[in-house]
Curated annotation (Swiss-Prot):
It is an enzyme of class 7 (translocase). One of its GO terms (cellular component) is plasma membrane. Pfam families: Complex1_30kDa (PF00329), Complex1_49kDa (PF00346). SUPFAM superfamilies: HydB/Nqo4-like (SSF56762), Nqo5-like (SSF143243). In the N-terminal section; belongs to the complex I 30 kDa subunit family. Its main location: membrane. Its EC number is 7.1.1.-. Transmembrane segments: none annotated. This is NADH-quinone oxidoreductase subunit C/D. It comes from Pseudomonas syringae pv. syringae (strain B728a). InterPro entries: NADH_DH_suC, NADH_DH_suCD, NADH_Q_OxRdtase_suD, NADH_quin_OxRdtase_su_C/D-like, NADH_UbQ_OxRdtase_30kDa_su, NADH_UbQ_OxRdtase_49kDa_CS, NDH1_su_D/H, NiFe-Hase_large. It catalyses: a quinone + NADH + 5 H(+)(in) = a quinol + NAD(+) + 4 H(+)(out). The lineage of its organism: Bacteria, Pseudomonadati, Pseudomonadota, Gammaproteobacteria, Pseudomonadales.
Amino acid sequence: MTADNALYIPPYKADDQDVVVELNNRFGAEAFTAQPTRTGMPVLWVERARLFEILTFLRNVPKPYSMLYDLHGVDERLRTNRRGLPGADFTVFYHLLSIERNSDVMIKVALSESDLSVPTITSIWPNANWYEREVWDMFGIDFPGHPHLSRIMMPPTWEGHPLRKDFPARATEFDPYSLTLAKQQLEEEAARFRPEDWGMKRSGANEDYMFLNLGPNHPSAHGAFRIILQLDGEEIVDCVPDIGYHHRGAEKMAERQSWHSFIPYTDRIDYLGGVMNNLPYVLSVEKLAGIKVPEKVDVIRIMMAEFFRITSHLLFLGTYIQDVGAMTPVFFTFTDRQKAYTVIEAITGFRLHPAWYRIGGVAHDLPRGWEKLVKDFVDWLPKRLDEYTKAALQNSILKGRTIGVAAYNTKEALEWGVTGAGLRSTGCDFDLRKARPYSGYENFEFEVPLAANGDAYDRCMVRVEEMRQSIKIIDQCMRNMPEGPYKADHPLTTPPPKERTLQHIETLITHFLQVSWGPVMPANESFQMIEATKGINSYYLTSDGGTMSYRTRIRTPSYPHLQQIPSVIKGSMVADLIAYLGSIDFVMADVDR
């Protein structure tokens, strides 16, 4: 598929009910229980016995739901606001996305604590593999028929399932930790790779295979990431990605932080994305609260998000070129990032992790003189990108190392849940800023960069062009910044506007309670996805009518991107794997959360 014959993507229509009509016609309306939410999509509960055939139908329906966007679970046992919903101790939900419809649907199945099992759907969507492993790891829900149901985030020796409500959320609730020599040896043995466990043979007809650990401390692994390679010489026969070394329990943390105090934690998901991480979270919370932010807030948020798209892509560009052997450009890209951080720091007060967006607005207004800082950067960067393109990206060695390497097409990308530049490099014109505009992106003029071959070179070139488009967006923000407040005038805006606290005791009380205890969000569910630096990032929030989230599901783009690796790299050389890893653009914090 090329940019010329890319799929037609219709205008986005929230809560599109067409699929509900199709499902009712095929299975009968009695097969579904509709749940009203603020997720912007139909949410349907089904019986476990009919789950597989319903999902199969959605996978094969005309204009199919080609992507399993997300799959995870909820411990419902302590949830009090469940009126009208099927009885459940646990829930497994399936979030499906159709590019051709430009719409989503969520299917839920209720489970009792005494029978925690649901059939695997790895035969329908291959990327269900890791998601089902994570649900088993976090909740203890079984998936009969899964090819290798094992821990994925937690160590193999871990006891318990962390996202259950009865599992401790704080280290102080555990006994003091000690690592004896015997336990250390046990952990090392548990991490030993056994090919037979993964259906691999130690030898072929005429050769013995070598098994090589790449990582978890290899410079080309881009973080604490391990890939076990089955090699015939330098050819990769098969491989097994091993993740979880960077897992910090971000979703568990969200259950014990207020809606307001969780904002800094979002910065640490994709730690190169800065305020881009804040955006889907605060937008989702604002849906729960019913907050509509002023136009100025939207424009400020877009401008700063695009600044972080540029800083993230500059780091990608330098490390990508370094991965294929050129050592100098990475020093230039890091230096150039500092110019962006000078602007970011002047506006937000921080550099990498500003935690600057707020529920209902941003932390403070733009400082005096911000326009000159932004204009200087906007005028300067395009010439630098021209230099990178001429000096490095047109280099014959780099092109020889990356053109035609680790290529996949649109169909394969959708099956594995690939989004962002990885999807658009195949010719699929799907960018949420255009396909499903949020925060006012529909008011800006910019192009969606596309390529055709879906290889390691195209993925890089798409990101370079994305930086040019980000500059265009930032320039429009600078020239058209509206007047007005930087926070919404709403009771759940957190913190409330400071000025009134000096005049009204009621506002002062609200300010104190919302900052210390957190705002009380109405019981409901909300969802927001955005076009983040590495692909589509989203927050699916469940409120039980309290000051903290009942369940926070963070779907990151890098997680499915790493799961796809074996399907793309088999039959290639180890050197090609290094180029492929560099072209994915991932950080392990985004994968492991």
